[in-house]
Every structure is written in C-alpha cells, then in structure tokens.
Curated annotation (Swiss-Prot):
The pyruvate dehydrogenase complex catalyzes the overall conversion of pyruvate to acetyl-CoA and CO(2). It contains multiple copies of three enzymatic components: pyruvate dehydrogenase (E1), dihydrolipoamide acetyltransferase (E2) and lipoamide dehydrogenase (E3). Signal peptide: none annotated. Heterodimer of an alpha and a beta chain. This is Pyruvate dehydrogenase E1 component subunit beta. Its cofactor is thiamine diphosphate. It is an enzyme of class 1 (oxidoreductase). Its EC number is 1.2.4.1. SUPFAM superfamilies: Thiamin diphosphate-binding fold (THDP-binding), TK C-terminal domain-like. It holds the Pfam family Transket_pyr. Keywords: Oxidoreductase, Pyruvate, Thiamine pyrophosphate. Thiamine diphosphate binds at residue 73. It catalyses: N(6)-[(R)-lipoyl]-L-lysyl-[protein] + pyruvate + H(+) = N(6)-[(R)-S(8)-acetyldihydrolipoyl]-L-lysyl-[protein] + CO2. It comes from Leifsonia xyli subsp. xyli (strain CTCB07). InterPro entries: THDP-binding, Transketo_C/PFOR_II, Transketolase-like_Pyr-bd, Transketolase_C.
Length: 337
C-alpha cells in the first residue's frame, strides 16, 4: 500500500519576522488576492529591491506584475497614475527617501489631485513605498524624513508603521484603499524581528495607538522614533518617572483621540521626530494639542527633532538624530514646570 503524501505544515498564525519579511508577506497577500495589484520600481524583480522587500515576488507572479523599471522616478509615478486610471492598483517602490523628489511633481500635481479633478469619477489606488529616516549610516538623500512635504498636500494619505505586525497589515490596507497612499518604511526597523499575527488585525489603517502606558508625561512618535521613545520611557521608569508613548502610525489623517486622552491624563506632551522641527508634522501635533487640550496642559508642548540643517555625513548621524537622552532631556524640562 502506498503511503499517503505528508501534508504541508501550515504556517503558524504568529510568526517572528523582521519588517522586510513582513512587508514581503503583505505584498504577496495583496498580489494573490487581486490580479490588478502590480509592483513597479528599480530593481524590484530578480534583485528583490535594495532592501529585498520584493524578493521572490517576480519569480512567483511574473515580470508583468512585478516590473523592473528604468531609473526615472517621475516616469515610474506617472506610469502608476496611468495604470490606476485603467483600473489597476500599482505599488511603487522608491529606493531611498531622497530619490522621491524627481517624482515629486507627479505626486503633488497629478496623483494627489486626479480624483478631485474628475469629481470622483476616477480613483487613484496607488501606493508609493518610501524608506524613511536614518540610523543606517548612509549619506544625504538616503536617510532623510520627508513626511512634511507630503502631509501638506491635500489628497494624499500618509502612513508610517513602526512594527513588523503593523507593516504586514498596513501595506495590505494601503493597497486596498482607493486613495493614493504614501507608505513610509523606517529603515532602522527593517531588520529587528517582531511578532506578526497573520490572522488578526486589531487597528484600522489610520488609527494611532498607545504603546506604553504612563502618568507623568506623554511622548508622541512615529516610524523609527517609536522604539527610541520606548527606550526613553524604560530609562525614565528606572529613575521613577512614568512616561506614556503614543505611536501615531498615520500622519495624514492623524487620529488625535488617543493623543488627547493621553495628554488629558498626563498634562504634558513631548513630540519626537527624526525630521527637522521647522514646519513639520511635530509642529502640527503640537498646535492641535495646544488648541484642543490647552486646559489640560501643565507645561508647554515641547519637541525633539532633527536639526534644521542638511543631513550630515554618516559619521555625524548620531549627533543629528534624536536619541533617548535627548528625549529625556526635554521630558525633564517639561516636568520642571
């Protein structure tokens, strides 16, 4: 009697994955679920992208769905816009954050405005994936945080996961959206592993979340600054201070409800970001909290940010980017009021 073939072991519901693998799995799920989903970008095919986020996808789904493009960001974004008008759901990969600017005109004057221009008769289900932030020891154009440019542009949704679990689910939700989504991926979080629950997604795409409870002050952060803020909270706890940390997750729109609840409890707010502080997402958060929670504040809203200078050479990166010590220094100023 022939032995029955062994059944393949099902993948575990909860897996420990780095963000690059979580994104890869999320993209694969989207490609399987909808034949209209396409991936476009430089070296996204056999190479799998600079960070290997698309590794193996072209061999599985073919070169007509995972498309290697020329080095021409304006052309890549423009092609994605045309594909969206024909009913496709293109996902564009930008190799590094500074490389998005050659495509900036297409994003801000066409992609963001197309649906409004046609009174809603045309939708723009385009996702633009952009590596975000620093902590990788690179040079200018490779580790900047350009979210404020896009957050100021009406018509774009902007998200920035900080964990592999969020990355897995948020990339799928972004692809399912009928609006254009700028999807920032913190490079400092690409490789550390985290638990990914592939069956349960507890939060909608644009929900912010309290990731650590506290009573003395609130820290708001996003993307690669979330683990830095959590580290600051751990150090503070050892010194007898209780800090609450809120992960925004979405930068446009911003879900302020958890932020305001937290500030009403703690009476103090510190906003931490990698980008320069001037005219930034952090500026907006500070302004809105000042408007909506003024009578709950025991101290001015304070910010920790990258300096208002061009990004420095790699060896000076650690001096430029906020770390736990800089966050705690500002927290101490807040608590001193």
């Amino acid at each position: 009697m022939e032995r029955a073939p062994a059944l393949a072991e099902p993948e575990p519901r909860v897996q420990s994955l780095p963000m690059v693998k979580a994104l890869n799995a999320g993209l694969r799920q989207a490609l399987v679920a909808d034949p209209k989903v396409l991936i476009l970008g430089e070296d996204v095919g056999p190479l799998g992208g600079v960070f290997r986020v698309t590794e193996g996808l072209q061999s599985e789904f073919g070169a007509s769905r995972v498309v290697d493009t020329p080095l021409a960001e304006a052309g890549i974004v423009g092609t994605a816009i045309g594909l969206a008008m024909r009913g496709y759901r293109p996902v564009v990969e930008i190799q590094f954050n500074g490389f998005v600017f050659p495509g900036f005109d297409q994003i801000t004057t066409q992609l963001a405005k197309m649906a409004n221009r046609h009174s809603g008769a045309v939708s723009m289900p385009v996702v633009i994936r952009i590596p975000h932030g620093g902590h990788i020891g690179a040079v200018e154009h490779h580790q900047e945080a350009p979210e404020a440019y896009f957050a100021h542009t009406a018509g774009l949704r902007i998200v920035a996961p900080s964990t592999p679990h969020d990355a897995y689910w948020m990339i799928q939700e972004a692809i399912a959206s009928d609006d254009p989504v700028i999807f920032f991926e913190p490079m400092s979080r690409y490789w550390p592993k985290g638990e990914v629950d592939t069956l349960e997604n507890p939060l909608p795409l644009h929900a912010s979340r309290i990731v650590r409870s506290g009573t003395d002050a609130t820290i708001v952060a996003w993307a690669g600054m979330v683990p830095v803020a959590l580290r600051a909270a751990e150090i503070a706890a050892e010194e007898g201070r209780s800090l609450e940390v809120v992960d925004l997750r979405s930068l446009a729109p911003i879900d302020y409800a958890p932020v305001l609840r937290s500030v009403q409890k703690t009476g103090r707010l510190v906003v931490a970001q990698e980008a320069p502080g001037i005219v930034s997402v952090g500026s907006e958060v500070a302004a809105v909290v000042g408007e909506k929670a003024f009578y709950s504040l025991e101290a001015p809203v304070l910010r920790v940010a990258g300096f208002d200078t061009p990004f420095p050479p790699a060896k000076l990166e650690s001096l430029y980017l906020p770390d736990a010590d800089r966050i705690l220094e500002v927290v101490d100023r807040s608590l001193a009021y």
